[in-house]
Amino acid sequence: MKYYTALTIAGSDSCGGAGIQADIKTMSALGVYASSAITAITVQNTKGVYGIQNVEPEIVKGQIEAVMDDIHPDAIKIGMVNDCDTIRAITETLKKYEDQFQHLVIDPVMVSTSGCRLMQEDALDVFIHDLLPLATLLTPNIPEAEILAGIKIQNVEDIKSAASAISKLGCRYVLIKGGHFGGNEKIDYLFEDGKLITSYRGMNIETRNTHGTGCTLSSAITSYLTREMDMNTAIAMAKTYLSGAILAGKNVKIGEGHGPVNHFFEPKALFFK
């Protein structure tokens, strides 16, 4: 007997709403045993990011190896990776274990909710050419998709063009999150090999508590993939979970800025294989 297990590789958020903390909360709430490898320590709260200390690449590599050699996670999620050396270390390490995990979900964290840049400019090319081709699924929002595709996105046709360009970089599935368009309805678009296969509609929930929503969604998708669901089902269920978490925490005041979602609005016990 064994739990379903996942590994998150990301930065630490001292206020607990995003990053590694949000990933572990999400995976735990969805009944998946979470392990972690920390890439950076951030100094932040709900109002902003005030400092970033990268973890030495050898330590990042060691954390991943320790988990892979012992826990054998079913799926992996990658969030904040800030510099070239860390990205190379992660890529080289994961390539050694490619036959051990089925899915790699990458959330290309580039800018925080408060507007702080979280990926060094010179790291983008290394991220695109080294790490991105290993991904099963990439989950960019509109600004991140614009950076990765090198185009401005103003409508759905632009989203399709961006997804086509991103898919050519080597990632099979691309989920472009349309939340940054505004309006009463939020639509995310899923592409497979550059072709639109489905979209996910959700209501716009009025709240300041949006800190860590991208981390939460990608971790939820990873959790459902860990539990052997197909990509479409995993994303649909993750979207439902995120909406529930936002709704459950929309009126709660944590801090003076963008507060967190309520990850534990409907927690599950750990699932067994």
Per-range role (PLM):
Residues 2-8, 28-106, 110-113, 264-267:
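Conserved N-terminal subdomain of the carbohydrate kinase-like
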Residues 9-15, 197-211:
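Short pre-catalytic strand/loop immediately N-terminal to key active-site residues, enriched for Gly-Thr
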Residues 16-32:
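N-terminal basic/disordered segments at the start of proteins
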Residues 31-35, 196-198, 224-238:
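Phosphate-handling active-site elements
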Residues 54, 233-273:
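Charged C-terminal helix
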Residues 121-197:
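Conserved phosphate/ATP/ADP-binding segment of small-molecule kinases
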Residues 146-147, 207-231:
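Short, small-residue alpha-helix embedded
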